[in-house]
From Swiss-Prot:
Domain of life of the native organism: Bacteria
Reaction(s) catalysed by this chain's protein: tRNA(Thr) + L-threonine + ATP = L-threonyl-tRNA(Thr) + AMP + diphosphate + H(+)
Organism field: Aster yellows witches'-broom phytoplasma (strain AYWB)
Cofactor: binding details: Binds 1 zinc ion per subunit.
A GO cellular component entry from the record: cytoplasm
One Pfam family named in its UniProt record: tRNA_SAD
Subcellular location: Cytoplasm
Protein name: Threonine--tRNA ligase
Gene Ontology MF terms in the entry: ATP binding; metal ion binding; threonine-tRNA ligase activity; tRNA binding
UniProt family annotation: Belongs to the class-II aminoacyl-tRNA synthetase family.
Gene3D superfamilies listed in its UniProt record: 3.10.20.30, Anticodon-binding domain, Bira Bifunctional Protein, Domain 2, Threonyl-trna Synthetase, Chain A, domain 2
Length: 641
């Protein structure tokens, strides 16, 4: 007999081999409707998994987020089975559940598929669902697995990783696959799904390997949930900064130049320049010292910092020079700022020292991960490093958070949460080895946030290798989560670079480094702004704030030019549309470009020294004096509206 604890701390004895489904039917069906899977001692298992030891059982129902992951993993197998029926020669690699669905990487060998094939695959998937195959788990030896998948070279490679582990396969009808699970127990539980897109992906993410076909999909328990998600995808497409950019012409990429290397076009460069000037001025008001440092460095610098050991796969190849020197494009700015601190001796009275930079960095993102401005290979980070005494940590973190919240207010960022990231105490190998340091750093961060009275969440295992961090997770207009701001405590780099200050006792002491970014990279922040505003920038950020539209270029251009000069003297960004088009066409074009104010100038305006304007998205026209219009614009800019 085994003892199982479950709902409401009940403990019952069961025959060894009893399944979660049997326990649910006997004891839990009234409390938990529509079971999907289970957790046994916090480990996910199938409903038909035989329990053979004492433990705690938790039933996962359709409403549990973990259940959606199980469903999507199972749908990946359902899709693979359908593909196998349609393309018997297809070779399957991996098919995991991901954040909003699943994908499967497949070598179709002699076949090529496209989006036109999605409906055919979905039709077979629905057929298999109706066949209601039982999905069963089977544990086999390494040798048996090698024979079972002898036809599939990809599985042979994957199996080598599990030579000394328990190997499991899952079967449903004629289909079987190498998999850890967990899955639903029958195919007819998989009903509401959609294949979404197709792309290329290297086997195991290695560009040296063959390019496979990656098919993405998603699955839900309810038909309406699927419909709602598909509608959300359509809304995302409308907000996608890559799509909006086709109209606004803010940035571009060029294959001849290289993947993930953005060009900032005039209008995008204008927005970036405004953001950069804003953030620099804001940081100067907080007593930061702004610097410029080289975009590359000797590899020795990154050996000392530890990046060569922990971050080499994300760095570009080393450049070996004739004189033996080895240089590398920097993936981070922190080692350079360590060098600035180390240039001079420091007294405890000088601290904290705040060094900031809009620092260009280069990171070797895999080709499949590069996406618009959100994932690029060249980026400029709003970076800073604060060198402080240990007794100054709390106060500095509070100042950083106040700075972040001020910036968020100006950019109208309202939906966010604080997340404290700690190391995983059960898996400390990938972190700097100093238990006392980790304890002190995590304790300090947590106490500081509590003293500020701010709500926060905790994330175990998400810390940087050199210390715990505070991330500000921003939720965009469509509910997606992204990290814009981060604060990281670092007790390691000061040791590695032997940084010191002279204390009151006239002895050398070790400072603490606080890494900090407020608006992430310029690239990611512009993408965020575009998607949040749908390209309708507030007046203070708009690349063109006012478009002057003369009704007749020959008659009204000169007066339009005078108004342009008047506005430019007040530092407004103004253009004139003097093209030989109709007035209606010019106004529609201005709307398409999402220009905040469109000013029409005709005879009435010219004779009476007036302007007639309409705001973006409005049909209402207002006629006022030029100086009144200037005052209106100034107020809007001042209010960051």
């Amino acid at each position: 007999m085994i003892k199982i604890s479950f709902f409401d701390n009940q403990i019952q004895e069961f025959i060894s081999g009893t399944t979660p489904l049997a326990i649910w039917k006997e004891h839990l069906s009234e409390h938990f409707k529509k079971p999907v899977a289970a957790l046994f001692n916090n480990q996910p298992i199938e409903l038909d998994f035989p329990l053979k030891k004492n433990g705690n059982l938790e039933i996962l129902t359709e409403s549990d987020p973990k259940s959606l992951e199980v469903l999507n993993h199972s749908t990946a197998h359902l899709m693979a089975q359908a593909v196998a029926r349609l393309y018997p020669d297809a070779l399957f690699t991996v098919g995991p559940a991901i954040k909003e669905g699943f994908y499967y990487d497949i070598d179709f060998q002699k076949h090529t598929i496209s989006e036109k094939d999605f409906l055919t695959i979905e039709k077979v998937m629905h057929q298999i669902s109706l066949e209601n195959h039982k999905i069963t788990r089977e544990e086999i030896s390494f040798e048996k697995a090698k024979k079972l998948f002898a036809y599939n070279p990809y599985k042979q490679v994957l199996l080598e990783k599990f030579r000394d582990q328990t190997i499991s396969i899952y079967r449903q009808g004629e289909f079987f696959d190498l998999c850890r699970g967990v899955h639903v127990i029958k195919t007819n539980l998989i009903k509401h799904f959609k294949i979404l897109k197709i792309s290329g992906a290297y086997f195991q993410g290695d560009a040296k390997n063959k390019t496979l076909t990656r098919i993405y999909g998603t699955s839900f328990f309810k038909k309406q949930a699927l419909a709602d998600y598909l509608q959300l995808l359509e809304e995302r497409k409308e907000r996608d900064h890559k799509k909006i950019n086709k109209e606004l012409d803010l940035f571009m990429f060029n294959k001849e130049v290289g993947l993930g290397l953005p060009f900032w076009l005039p209008k995008g460069a204008t927005v970036r320049r405004i953001v950069e000037r804003y953030i620099v001025d804001k940081e100067l008001s907080y007593d930061y010292h702004h610097v410029y440092t080289p975009i590359m460095a000797n590899t020795e610098l990154y050996r000392i910092s530890g990046h060569l050991d922990h971050y080499a796969s994300n760095m570009f190849p080393i450049m070996s020079l004739e004189n033996g020197e080895k240089l590398v494009l920097r993936p981070m700015n922190c080692p350079h700022h360590m060098m600035i601190y180390k240039k001079n001796p420091h007294s405890y009275k000088e601290l904290p020292l705040r060094i900031a930079e809009l620092g260009m960095m280069h990171r070797f993102e895999k080709s499949g991960a590069v996406s618009g401005l959100q994932r690029v290979r060249e980026m400029t980070l709003n970076d800073a490093h604060i060198f402080a005494r240990p007794d100054q940590i709390k106060e500095e973190i509070k100042k950083i958070i106040n700075l972040i919240l001020e910036v968020y207010c100006d950019f109208n960022i309202k939906n966010y949460e604080l997340r404290l990231s700690y190391r995983n105490p059960n898996n400390t190998e990938k972190y700097f080895n100093d238990d006392q340091m980790w304890y002190n750093a995590e304790k300090t961060l947590k106490e500081t946030i509590k003293e500020l009275g701010l709500p926060f969440k905790e994330a175990i295992g998400e810390a940087a290798f050199y210390g715990p961090k505070l991330d500000v997770q921003v939720f965009n207009a469509l509910g997606n989560e992204e990290t814009l701001s981060t604060v990281q405590l670092d007790f390691l780099l000061p040791q590695k670079f032997d940084l010191t200050f002279i204390g009151e006792d006239n002895k050398h002491h070790r400072p603490v480094v606080i890494h900090r970014a407020v608006v992430s990279t310029m690239e990611r922040f512009l993408a965020h702004l575009v998607e949040e505003t749908k390209g309708v920038f507030p007046l203070w950020l708009a690349p063109v704030q006012v478009l002057l539209i003369p009704v007749s270029a020959p008659l009204h251009f000169e007066f339009s030019q005078k108004i342009k000069e008047t506005l430019q003297l007040q530092n407004f960004r103004v253009e004139i549309n003097s093209k030989d088009n109709t007035l209606g066409y010019k106004i529609r074009e201005a709307q398409k470009l999402k220009i905040p104010y469109q000013v029409v100038i005709g005879d009435h305006e010219m004779i009476n020294n007036l302007i007639t304007f309409r705001k973006y998205g409005s049909h209402l026209q207002t006629t006022i004096k030029v100086d009144e219009f200037v005052s209106l614009l100034k107020d809007k800019v001042l209010q960051k509206k």
